[in-house]
Amino acid sequence: MSYSYAEKKRIRKEFGVLPHILDVPYLLSIQTESYKKFLTADAAKGRLHSGLEIVLKQSFPVESKNGQYELHYVDYQIGEPTFDETECQVRGATYDAPLNVKLRLVVYNKDALPNEKIVEDIREEYVYMGDIPLMTTNGTFIINGTERVVVSQLHRSPGVFFSKDDSEEGAFSARIIPYRGSWLDFEFDSKGIIWARIDRKRKFCATVILKALGYTQEQILENFSETKTITFNSKGFALRLDNLSNMKGELLKFDIVDAQDNVIVKKNKKLTSRDVKKIKDAGVDSVAIDFDLVSTLRVAKDIVNEATGEVIAYANDDVTESLLESCVEVGMLELEVIDFITTERGRYISDTLKYDLTRNTDEALVEIYKVLRPGDPPAAASVKALFEGLFFIESRYSLSDIGRMKLNARLGSDKVSKDIYTLENSDIVGVIEELINIRDGKGKVDDIDHLGNRRVRSVGEMVENQFRIGLYRVEKGIRESMSLVHKDKLMPKDIVNSKPITAAIKEFFTSGALSQFMDQDNPLSEVTHKRRISALGPGGLSRDRAGFEVRDVHATHYGRLCPIETPEGPNIGLINSLASYARVNDYGFLEAPYRKVVDGKVTDEIEYLSAIDEDNYVIAQASTKLDENNHFVEDLIQCRSGGEAIFTESSRVQYMDVSAKQMVSAAAALIPFLEHDDANRVLMGANMQRQAVPTLKSEKPLVGTGMEKIVARDSGNCIIARNAGEVAEVDSNRIVIKVDTEKSQTSNLVDIYSLTKFKRSNKNTCINQRPIVNVGDKVEAGDILADGFATDFGELSLGHNLMVAFMPWNGYNFEDSILLSERIVKDDKYTSIHIEEFTCVARDTKLGPEEITADIPNVSESSLAKLDESGIVHIGANVEAGDILVAKITPKAEQQLTPEERLLRAIFNEKASNVADSSLRMPSGTSGTVINVQVFENDKGGKSKRALKIEKELIDKARKDFDEEFAVIESVVKSSIEQEVVGAKIQKAKGLKKGAILTKEFLATLPFSKWLEISFEDEKLEEKVQNAREYYEEAKIAIDAKFEAKKKSITQSNELSPGVLKTVKVFVAIKKRIQPGDKMAGRHGNKGVVSRVLPVEDMPYMEDGTPVDVCLNPLGIPSRMNIGQILEAHLGLASYGLGKKIEKTLEKTRKAAELRKTLEEVYNSVGDKKVNLEALNDEEILTLCDNLKGGVPIATPVFDGAKEEDIKSLLKIGGFATNGQMKLFDGRTGKPFDRHVTVGYMYMLKLDHLVDDKMHARSTGSYSLVTQQPLGGKAQFGGQRFGEMEVWALQAYGAAYTLREMLTVKSDDIAGRSKMYKNIVDGKLTMNVDVPESFNVLRNEVRALGIDMDFDYSSEEE
């Protein structure tokens, strides 16, 4: 087994028995693939069936009303973005690119005859059609400077669905849902009548739709019912027994007798195959029935007197005595009737036709028009156009390829081609037929929560739909423009207005429910946000009306949606996460991978199955035992089939799971020993990992699952090598790799990677990248070069490993509280950096422009000490609460001065200050260091000194960066040429003869530019040098061009909002140490609040004097049933012991051979998966050992983790008791505790619920307008609510004075609180109480009821 660069530095020992069959697919592919499909920028691959191309093709050509102009679509191009991703974030711009569409305007001769079209002119040009937001490499969008994610939506798939309303007997319904257009419903009522609805409007008879489609009453009955023939004569009535086989399973309503009056089959019996044979053998072809039965029948076809042409009865008329008499009169002794006798099937349509008052197609169309447009007069043309537009015109109704596929599959017919996306007559007839079958018990209703009936709509598809909406508006505009514009040489640009497209797309990205502000607490929260699948949003469910069924875990979720990770609260079950191996197919259905089983042998061939396909197979679990030939060991195997868990013979198995973790999401797969935790707690654990704050120093988990590196790699926060090569240069800002051209398919000789330094994330955490490679290291493509935030050697590291003791300690861990050691604070283990952005905007006001300046009236020098001459804070300044960050003045209206004030001003020579101080100050409760300042100005007033200074710094930095980049390229080209040419024969060189040998010394005397002028006799060598020469020249041109582009973007004017003159952004880094009140958690849903930070010397300690870091309450485990944390602690302790073992070996010797023995014991004595230490050289073994001193990292994959025996064996090797318990001593007294305590290493996270962000205090502040009570909450700088129950408490103690001030001066007694403030200033310690404002509100409310109520002050005066 080969190891990557980062893995060699620290190999994770892996438990788990199952073989590795399939790599976890790229975690962000659901986002990137979907949007790539939408843009389909690569025309060579054929932009045909999706995205922009199809929308544009469907919308064009557009024809003018008079037919003179036609606008055709030809092609489109997506331009280059103005700014790159980082620049857009800095400037608050959107990362997008212009869409230019090539349109062809065809002009026809207006004098030509109406039926012929003579082309007069064709004009073609590219037309700007708005800006399309581009997706960043990590699957996000930058909209107005902020990173956003478009969450995929799980919605009901287009197609037909049959369901049953349990509240009513026989209330079955069918609903045809298109991708775009009107919904069509058919439903049974309790009487067996079939009703139809369009778009959930008023219901009408289903037969109205059939008549509107052109069917006659007779044709409708023929389609939906069986017919029987009745013969009648003087003896009575007889029913012909045709198609006996069709009657099988039906209940007989009469006895069947033979010629001798023997009963062959009795009445009220279900007919069987044996009965049918008996009847046929007896030669019975008809059976006598009485008139009572005949009178329940109806005529199947119109009965016409052939002699006169008179209609005796219409189809569906009841059979009556008079009708029979009329038939006898004209000599008809046979009557074709609808078969209600042997089946109920025909009665539903027949009864519906009885209710249906329309007689033909025209009346049916009018009836539908009245339902959809009540009040509108129905005109013949508009009536037909409305009905056709509903279901039969592709621009207004589309089932889409998914809907057509689902509809054909559900009706079990392929009569309609896959390419027809509108409804056909046969579809509607088929749906009604199937509905009748279901009512008759011959079909099944659909399970709406089955993932075969729900599909995922990803970002590309949503943007495509928005684009279609915008384009539809543009199309209407084009038609209007064609008829209004009178221009000799009309061009496409003149008639196309692209604003509706821009508006539709902008609206979707800025205010759409599924376009969300990216969760960026840590890399995991980014990844899970992008993999989220929501059932909410437009066209989805609403959380108020979603029931239990839709939220529940369904059998089809297996391997597709995670059954664990979902929010707690009102959205539970509506927002899900994609399972780790799941993918979305071309139709939008979720698929899971399986290994194919052929003739009882499990192959490594992988097949992806959708939920519909999976129902038909028997699938074995990933943990099923196999022999060395991949055959099943056991005869009876636990499998899944049709959504049920079954035991079955191994010969029946068709597929097998790929991995044990395929049913859970990426976040749940990060929890070790997940299988030993209760599902509710795992849900909390998976959700809380997303809230972990990245700390100053990242530390890998000692006990992981092996999923850490996958999440870190795919999150895009680490820097990954594009090509193999050697590290040429490293510093904190840049890594330079000299590319190995033999291994890499690239013409580049150098790869340069720029690192992100101290960037603010969406959640104000700090994004920072650190290189992990050294100069001279050899790296392969795909190796990690630099860690991002919350990663350690390319592994996700959300917290720290702490030594935990499960024991109570003086009540400080009561109710999930956490007792911490001071060592954690000293070592800055949970210290995190938060970057806050403060913005100051100078606007143009009515009274004049606001000004950012250091010259502010009535502000002391000390307050301005941290500002520069422009009035903006210096970078590096330490700022406290209340400090000025940006000094700004706002003009205020002139005020009239009293004579006294004018006199004073004259005496003290003070100028009238007509400006107010509106500076940006540091908010209360915060302090930190200014790390960056950005100034944005419009060009009108010229740039300020600070703006010019920042601009110059950026240009100088860019110049330096590009110069250094070029120097690196030059040195690489130089060394590669030198290696090739030294010792070669010269063709031509200044200072040397032809045929001379080139030496290193001679090259050293020449500048590099002259090297490139030397030519050689060897043609191959000459070609190589020529290639290097060309690469060097191209690189020089490219770097100059890049610098010019960068310079242009730095100096480019900023587009500020209207009325804004200048915007200043100040970034302050705030360091937050862990303190009491902060929330911490493990990975098993074991959360708590820090109650106390205890000095190290008071913490319980082990026999060797090592103090523990954390004391957790043992009572938090049994009831919560998250035993995984105990196993993690045991395995963590073993890992720590193994690290100590390696450290002791290192202290004795640094010989690789000895170290290999220790490593062999540590890695390969326990567990099935061995580590190949032979793949590492001696130097790498030493580095590995140095990195393992703190503990040997262990991976225990979910559902395939370490067993109890493995943990005991490792504890033994690590030198600990196999029960994981030990004697602890009290740090305060030095005495041992009574019982042994479970001690181990657990990975603990600090969550983004910090006490600093919640604690807040107020003396005076703002008040509510109506009640005049202080506002509530930190954001409003509100007060502490003293509620009803608190008042009762004071009443119970009789604390009258305290109560009075709580309800008056401290709350809403306006006069009293003003007086109180004055009294405090004057040194008077008295309190004047007035009527609280809430009483006045009450009085006014009572007055509103017409009762005059006032307060009686007389008793007070007396």
Curated annotation (Swiss-Prot):
GO biological process: DNA-templated transcription
InterPro entries: DNA-dir_RNA_pol_bsu_ext_1_sf, DNA-dir_RNA_pol_bsu_external_1, DNA-dir_RNA_pol_su2, DNA-dir_RNAP_su2_dom, DNA-dir_RNAP_su2_hyb_sf, RNA_pol_bsu_bac, RNA_pol_bsu_CS, RNA_pol_bsu_protrusion
Domain of life assignment: Bacteria
Gene Ontology annotations for the cellular component aspect, listed alphabetically: DNA-directed RNA polymerase complex
Keywords of this entry: DNA-directed RNA polymerase, Nucleotidyltransferase, Transcription, Transferase
Principal EC category: transferase
EC number: 2.7.7.6
Known catalytic reactions: RNA(n) + a ribonucleoside 5'-triphosphate = RNA(n+1) + diphosphate
GO terms for MF: DNA binding; DNA-directed RNA polymerase activity; ribonucleoside binding
CDD domains, alphabetized: RNA_pol_B_RPB2
Function of the protein: DNA-dependent RNA polymerase catalyzes the transcription of DNA into RNA using the four ribonucleoside triphosphates as substrates.
Family: Belongs to the RNA polymerase beta chain family.
HAMAP family for this protein: RNApol_bact_RpoB
Subunit structure: The RNAP catalytic core consists of 2 alpha, 1 beta, 1 beta' and 1 omega subunit. When a sigma factor is associated with the core the holoenzyme is formed, which can initiate transcription.
Protein name per the record: DNA-directed RNA polymerase subunit beta
